[in-house]
Amino acid sequence: MENFFSILGGMGTMATESFVRLINHRTKATKDQEYLNYVLFNHATVPDRTAYILDRSEENPMPFLLDDIEKQNLLRPNFIVLTCNTAHYFFEELQAATDIPILHMPREAANELVRQHTTGRVAILGTEGSMKAGIYEREVKNLGFETVIPDTALQEKINYLIYHEIKESDHLNQELYYEILEEAVERLNCEKVILGCTELSLMNEFAEDNHYPVIDAQSILADRTIERALAERNEALDTVSEK
């Protein structure tokens, strides 16, 4: 297979399924051959990223992720998509282990703030691990935006939605989701809310009548993935036609 990309997912699996669904549905295709070529690594047994970030005595996910990168080096995709926000804590080490470009989901989400001409405060929602590591805060602040991190009470609600409702119970609790967004916009006085966890993106995919100003990181990554894959496919076709 030529002109393909690789998806490094499984963290978690339902969120990865959501990402794959997005790229398939958003790719404009009228026949099988017009869809995108990709390989999916659904590495569900990667140890919990947040658990390790919060407590270094927990099992380190890095060796598992590096093993995945070594396999990518053998396959030689055009680029790699990492569909776990918290795993971007290891991004620099992962990118250093390969010459294949890895798309940076938090950076793409931060760039979307610029595209949408954001001027106000930006709330960042995600796992405790990504909050502690500053994965999104760093990218957003680098572009000059004021960031707001959830306080303990709000973070507990986010944790409950991500881990208990979605990961453990496979339940998309729309009422709790909207309660969290309302707090971020109204109580924290934020113009935009970044969904910096793929479980939150999964929640957003199926939320009805969502009028909150969210920046859905996974949705944006899906769009950038499609754009890049199509551009590289077209470039390859142009090269062939010139010969």
UniProtKB/Swiss-Prot annotation:
The chemistry this enzyme catalyses reads:
L-aspartate = D-aspartate
Query: What's the EC number here?
Result: 5.1.1.13
Q: Which residues bind substrate?
A: 48-50, 85-87, 167
PROSITE patterns referenced in this protein's UniProt entry, alphabetically: ASP_GLU_RACEMASE_1, ASP_GLU_RACEMASE_2
Q: Which InterPro entries match?
A: Asp/Glu/hydantoin_racemase, Asp/Glu_race, Asp/Glu_racemase_AS_1, Asp/Glu_racemase_AS_2, Asp_race
Q: Identify the SUPFAM superfamilies for this entry.
A: Aspartate/glutamate racemase
Q: Is Isomerase included in the keywords of this UniProt record?
A: yes
| Highest taxon of the lineage | Bacteria
Q: Which residues form the active site?
A: 84 (proton donor/acceptor), 197 (proton donor/acceptor)
**A Pfam family matched by this chain, by name?**
Asp_Glu_race
The UniProt keywords, alphabetically, are: Isomerase
Q: One MF term in GO for this entry?
A: aspartate racemase activity
Subunit structure, per the record? Homodimer.
Q: Which family does it belong to?
A: Belongs to the aspartate/glutamate racemases family.
Q: Any idea what this protein is called?
A: Aspartate racemase
